[in-house]
């Protein structure tokens, strides 16, 4: 068993937007949704954008009017191919497969207490595996975990241990999480932000990146 220190960074993918999709019984990876309070005018900040909507190069933290303009531009480009639109849809796969559909999206009003409830439920999953002293909360949707003492305890590789946890999060809450594993906290964070988030989700719905000092020099 590898005795090298191992740390994990775990991020809940487009957390607020994913929760809103799940509450509507929609797939976060296939639903165009933005979390924003429309009652505050179109200058309000978009708190989260679903993974499906992000695939159109729409980032989070835009103001709502900027999102509206970006979607108008996307639909203008779609019309160059389609010539006309037969309907408006927020279903990502249908939009990909049918250029005659106008890209639409759901605007969900933020529900912070609900997001906190989901975050607490996921934190309880971490507590099933780790002592609280080894879990470092970075934000409502991101944690760092010192895996070092648990690899030997569970007789699992760091990858397999984190894979089990991400799968349990997905099974319990339907939220996809991405993770980075590294030989220090910095490398774990970089593995998550640069490697895991840019790779395709595997057949089990998981994204895990890994970096040690040698791989960091080689890949980055």
Regions found by a protein language model. Give the residues of each.
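Residues that scaffold, gate, or flank divalent-cation-dependent active/transport sites
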Residues: 1-140, 144, 151, 193-194
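Short, surface-exposed alpha-helical recognition segments that flank or form part
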Residues: 114, 156-157
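Active-site-proximal beta-alpha loop/turn segments in soluble metabolic enzymes
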Residues: 143-152, 186, 220
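Long, highly charged, low-complexity intrinsically disordered interaction regions
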Residues: 157-220
């Amino acid at each position: 068993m590898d005795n090298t220190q191992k740390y994990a960074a775990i991020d809940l993918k487009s957390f607020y937007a994913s929760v809103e999709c799940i509450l509507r019984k929609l797939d976060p990876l296939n639903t165009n949704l933005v979390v924003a309070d429309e009652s505050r005018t179109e200058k309000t900040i978009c708190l989260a954008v679903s993974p499906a909507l992000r695939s159109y190069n729409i980032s989070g933290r835009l103001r709502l009017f900027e999102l509206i303009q970006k979607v108008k531009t996307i639909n203008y480009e779609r019309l160059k191919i389609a010539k006309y639109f037969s309907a408006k849809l927020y279903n990502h796969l249908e939009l990909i497969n049918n250029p005659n559909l106008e890209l639409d999206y759901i605007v969900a009003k933020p529900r912070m207490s609900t997001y906190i409830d989901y975050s607490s439920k996921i934190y309880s999953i971490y507590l099933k595996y780790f002592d609280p002293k080894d879990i470092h909360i970075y934000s409502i949707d991101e944690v760092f975990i010192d895996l070092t003492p648990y690899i030997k305890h569970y007789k699992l590789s760091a990858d397999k241990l984190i894979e089990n946890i991400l799968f349990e999060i997905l099974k319990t809450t339907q939220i996809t999480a991405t993770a980075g594993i590294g030989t220090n906290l910095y490398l774990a964070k970089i593995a998550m932000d640069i490697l895991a988030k840019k790779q395709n989700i595997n057949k089990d719905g998981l994204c895990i990146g890994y970096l040690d000092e040698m791989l960091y020099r080689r890949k980055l």
